[in-house]
């Protein structure tokens, strides 16, 4: 019989889990089957082999290694003895202590790096899962989600070597993208603020114009009242006025109006006459209408309100000596003028309320907003450059990682289709893998099967023996990609019916360059072409 280049001869176990004292298994044949019911130690023996190949077998309830020891022992020892192509033997031993491990090759202590390096020279790669297969993990490889299957193949293909740098560059890219998005939103926010500012300014001008128009109508009504009162005054008021000495007018007499205003004992200085108020209101209405049109045409210009009117030169007339009848008429005129003064103050108050309610400061203008937009645009452009550089670096690494992953997937696809058809003994049967993302295939992989006269079906919908055959076909395809001298399969008959086991057995016997160790509960499975070892409870 042809044997692999390296062949496992014996397994020696001391105080490992359920095995007390020293326990030896072997020698092993090309295909060796362990038969026994649940609880006889089949799976523990498989775990012992995996322990030698470097698996930690962690227990989430016990952070130390006590879960590896039998009862109250303080250490466990597992040793594998191999026969080399030249006929010599090599022994690998791993010793588990309470918080650490020690390693031996032959009878010499070595470091963990030297130990794993020597195993690697014999093509034992536990990270690739091509040595040991467990009934709770790897044997159910196709039952994983698409993301879990992608992560599993990422480990097997060793494209996971790029993952730390990939994740770092991806984080930088995501941060750069979020920065670009943040500044873009900031620009949009300032642009919206600009539109609101312009709209609010125009609306303020509209309200101001409307309020002035209403106030003007009130003033006109007041003027009519004053004119009516003045019409009743006798002509001798005019004669009395002529008897009072005239004051010298301003040097700019021709350019200024002379207004006669009363001088009473209360000394109301600087009273606004009806003519001046009318003129002032008309100027304000005209000014605001022009400002409204100018703001529409030039929304980025500052808005300024002028409160100054034309200079008025007046002469004072003393009405204190007039009779009471005339004094009453004069007091009515003064009271009306006072009302106008209060109305003007009300206009100023309304204008200030508009400014306060809309939170518009006097120095707020379009130029300030445009400056903020310019600053935000500059930072947005800088963020775009950083994002472009981060994307370029990430893209280079993504291409390298995808290339290594695809170099693994291409031969795996071919092997999977062939092995599945061989095990199923149906040339029309087809099993294949499909990445969910072609640019980043390592993120998610889904497995499909196409039987005769059927559509493509996801393997996650399979049950029983059909699913087990797909699992084994995929495991054998992974092993064929980079074969190791030994493959261990625990509970190979799980969910297999007798006819399916008869399909698996011939395939194992044809793999002359690989040694197989399998466990089963059924003594009628895998017995025709293999060496059997029965384990008792």
From Swiss-Prot:
GO terms for molecular function: ATP binding; DNA binding. Expressed in the germline. SUPFAM superfamilies: P-loop containing nucleoside triphosphate hydrolases (SSF52540). GO terms for biological process: cell division; sister chromatid cohesion. The keyword Protein biosynthesis does not apply. GO terms for cellular component: cohesin complex; nucleus. Coiled coil: none annotated. The keyword Secreted does not apply. Interacts with dpy-27, mix-1, dpy-28, dpy-26, capg-1 and smc-4. Belongs to the SMC family. Acts as a modulator of condensin function, possibly by binding to the condensin SMC subunits and thereby inhibiting their function. Negatively regulates the condensin I complex in mitotic chromosome segregation. Negatively regulates the condensin I-like dosage compensation complex, which functions in the regulation of X chromosome-linked gene transcription, by limiting the association of the complex with the X chromosomes. This is Structural maintenance of chromosomes-like protein 1. It comes from Caenorhabditis elegans.
């Amino acid at each position: 019989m042809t044997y692999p280049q390296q062949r496992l001869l014996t397994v020696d176990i001391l105080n490992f889990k359920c095995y007390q004292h020293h326990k030896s298994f072997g020698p092993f044949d090309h295909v060796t089957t362990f038969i026994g019911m649940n609880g006889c130690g089949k799976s523990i023996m498989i775990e012992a082999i995996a322990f030698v190949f470097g698996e930690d077998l962690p227990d989430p309830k016990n952070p130390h290694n006590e879960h590896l020891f039998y009862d109250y022992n303080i250490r466990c020892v597992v040793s594998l003895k191999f026969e080399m192509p030249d006929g010599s033997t090599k022994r690998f031993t791993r010793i588990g202590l309470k918080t650490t491990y020690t390693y031996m090759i032959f009878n010499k202590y070595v470091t963990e790096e030297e130990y794993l390096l020597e195993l690697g020279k014999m093509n034992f790669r536990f990270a690739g899962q091509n040595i040991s297969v467990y009934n709770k993990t790897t044997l159910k490889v196709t039952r994983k989600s698409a993301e879990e299957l992608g992560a599993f193949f990422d480990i097997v293909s060793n494209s996971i070597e790029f993952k730390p740098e990939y994740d770092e560059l991806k984080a930088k890219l995501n941060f750069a993208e979020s920065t670009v998005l943040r500044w873009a939103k900031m620009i949009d926010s300032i642009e919206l603020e600009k539109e609101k500012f312009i709209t609010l300014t125009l609306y303020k001008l509209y309200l101001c114009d409307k309020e002035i128009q209403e106030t003007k109508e009130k003033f006109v009504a007041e003027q009519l009242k004053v004119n009516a009162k003045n019409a009743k005054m006798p002509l001798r008021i005019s004669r009395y006025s002529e008897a009072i000495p005239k004051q010298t007018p301003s040097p700019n007499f021709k350019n200024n109006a002379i207004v006669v205003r009363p001088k009473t004992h209360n000394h109301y200085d600087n009273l606004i006459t009806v003519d001046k108020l009318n003129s002032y209101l008309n100027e304000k209405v005209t000014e605001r209408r022009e400002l409204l049109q100018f703001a529409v045409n030039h929304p980025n210009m500052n808005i300024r309100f002028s409160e100054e009117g034309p200079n008025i030169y007046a002469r004072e007339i003393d009405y204190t000596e007039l009779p009471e009848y005339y004094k009453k008429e004069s007091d009515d005129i003064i009271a009306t003028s006072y009302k106008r003064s209060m109305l003007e103050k009300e206009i100023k108050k309304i204008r200030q309320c508009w400014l306060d309610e809309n939170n518009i400061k006097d120095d707020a203008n379009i130029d300030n907003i445009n400056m903020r937009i310019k600053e935000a645009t500059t930072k947005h452009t800088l963020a775009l450059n950083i994002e472009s550089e981060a994307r370029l670096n990430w893209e280079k690494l993504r291409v390298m990682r995808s290339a290594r992953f695809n170099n693994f997937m291409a031969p795996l696809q071919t092997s999977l289709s062939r092995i599945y058809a061989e095990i199923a003994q149906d040339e029309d049967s087809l099993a294949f893998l499909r990445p969910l993302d072609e640019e980043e295939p390592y993120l998610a992989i889904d497995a499909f099967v196409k039987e005769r006269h059927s559509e493509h079906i996801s393997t996650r919908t399979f049950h029983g023996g059909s699913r087990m055959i797909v699992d084994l076909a995929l495991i054998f395809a992974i092993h064929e990609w980079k074969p190791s001298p030994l493959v261990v399969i625990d509970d190979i008959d799980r969910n297999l019916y007798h006819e399916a086991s008869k399909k698996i057995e011939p395939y194992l016997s044809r793999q002359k360059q690989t040694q197989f160790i399998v466990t089963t509960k059924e003594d009628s499975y895998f017995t025709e072409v293999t060496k059997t070892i029965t384990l008792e409870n």
